[in-house]
Design a protein with these regions (language model features):
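Nucleotide-activated donor-binding/catalytic signature segment of Leloir-type glycosyltransferases, i.e.
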Residues: 87-103
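A charged, aromatic-enriched C-terminal amphipathic alpha-helix characteristic of glycosyltransferases
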Residues: 179-205
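Short glycine/serine-rich donor-binding loops of glycosyltransferases
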Residues: 128-131, 149
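Acidic anion/phosphate-binding donor-loop and adjacent secondary structure
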Residues: 2-3, 15-34
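Short hydrophobic beta-strand element within catalytic cores of glycosyltransferases
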Residues: 140-143
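Conserved acidic donor-binding segment of nucleotide-sugar-dependent glycosyltransferases
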Residues: 155-166, 174-179
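A conserved mid-protein helix/loop that constitutes part of the nucleotide-sugar donor-binding site
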Residues: 40, 49-64, 74, 81-87
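Aromatic "clamp/platform" in nucleotide-sugar-dependent glycosyltransferases that forms part
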Residues: 104, 123
Length: 205
């Protein structure tokens, strides 16, 4: 298919619509199971599978941050076949007070409101809807260079790192020391309108 120019010319990449009003509404629920003390907080939301999500990178980066005597917290929302392995790694590195396993959450959005930054350390992704969720809730993003991250995130909604522990660690350290913010507000209405226009164009082609 890559060599079929006619086919390529007739294709278009269309991302997901996003129900921003629902996300904003759900984010107002109160969190009661963590985070009473104020400290710089990273949030990771997703499956605990190492082949793609590579949470070992995040844990290794956290180890280096602790060695620097930096104060931080990482909230892990999700579960998977590597959860127990990750918990063992956290215990071995004595990171129990820094990395909190929250399990799956039917409504993860209140935890976004607790975070100073969303963080993804993946090796590969499709289009991460979690990017859009964070952008709607005005949460800056630290992510490895996957999918469309450079176009969507860099210099607008956060920082894009290389796929290695040192690059992730440096971005996290800089965020803790100097802060991190979205430089552009995400216009979800415009985003959904663009998706709708692409769909109409395909339907009418």
């Amino acid at each position: 298919l890559k060599n079929d120019k006619d086919f390529i010319n007739k294709t278009s990449v269309i991302y997901n619509f996003i129900d921003a009003e629902e996300i904003l509404r759900k984010s107002q629920e109160k969190v009661t199971d963590c985070c009473k003390e104020k400290t710089f907080t990273f949030l990771n939301v997703g499956r605990h599978t190492e082949e793609d999500k590579k949470l070992t990178r995040l844990i290794e980066a956290a180890k280096k941050l602790k060695e620097d005597n930096l104060y931080f917290r990482i909230l892990l929302v999700g579960s998977g076949n590597k959860t127990q392995e990750y918990k063992k790694m956290v215990n071995e590195y004595k990171l129990e007070n820094n990395i909190i396993f929250l399990g799956k959450k039917q409504n993860p959005y209140p935890y976004f409101k607790l975070a100073d930054s969303l963080i993804l350390t993946s090796e590969y992704e499709g289009f991460p809807v979690v990017y859009l969720e964070a952008m709607i809730l005005n949460i800056p993003i630290i992510t490895t260079n996957v999918s469309d991250s450079l176009r969507i995130i860099q210099n607008k909604h956060g920082v894009v790192t290389q796929k290695n522990v040192n690059s992730i660690y440096n971005a996290m350290k800089n965020a803790i020391i100097n802060g991190i913010s979205q430089k552009e507000e995400f216009d979800y209405k415009e985003y959904n309108q663009e998706i709708n226009e692409k769909l109409e164009k395909l339907i009418n082609a």
